[in-house]
Amino acid sequence: MVNWQVIGQLVSTGLIGLLGPAVIILLALKKGNL
């Protein structure tokens, strides 16, 4: 049996970990401040 709850938590945590820095970088690029 696959534990979808654990997989969902891992995926959501991974997405947040990847999207967090990406959003910060995009905001920095839009402001022109790196």
UniProtKB/Swiss-Prot annotation:
Which residue ranges does UniProt annotate as crossing the membrane?
Answer: 6-26
Chief location of this protein within or outside the cell: plastid
| Pfam families reported for this sequence | PSII_Ycf12
UniProt topology in membrane: Single-pass membrane protein
Q: Where in the cell is it found?
A: Plastid, Chloroplast thylakoid membrane
**What GO biological process, any one, is recorded here?**
photosynthesis
Record key words, sorted: Chloroplast, Membrane, Photosynthesis, Photosystem II, Plastid, Thylakoid, Transmembrane, Transmembrane helix
Q: Return the InterPro entries for the record.
A: PSII_Ycf12_core-subunit
Any one of the GO CC terms = photosystem II
Outline the subunit composition: PSII is composed of 1 copy each of membrane proteins PsbA, PsbB, PsbC, PsbD, PsbE, PsbF, PsbH, PsbI, PsbJ, PsbK, PsbL, PsbM, PsbT, PsbX, PsbY, PsbZ, Psb30/Ycf12, peripheral proteins of the oxygen-evolving complex and a large number of cofactors. It forms dimeric complexes.
Q: Which protein family is named in the record? A: Belongs to the Psb30/Ycf12 family.
HAMAP family in the record, alphabetically? PSII_Psb30_Ycf12
Briefly state the protein's biological role: A core subunit of photosystem II (PSII), probably helps stabilize the reaction center.
What protein name does the entry list? Photosystem II reaction center protein Psb30
Q: Which organism is it from?
A: Skeletonema costatum
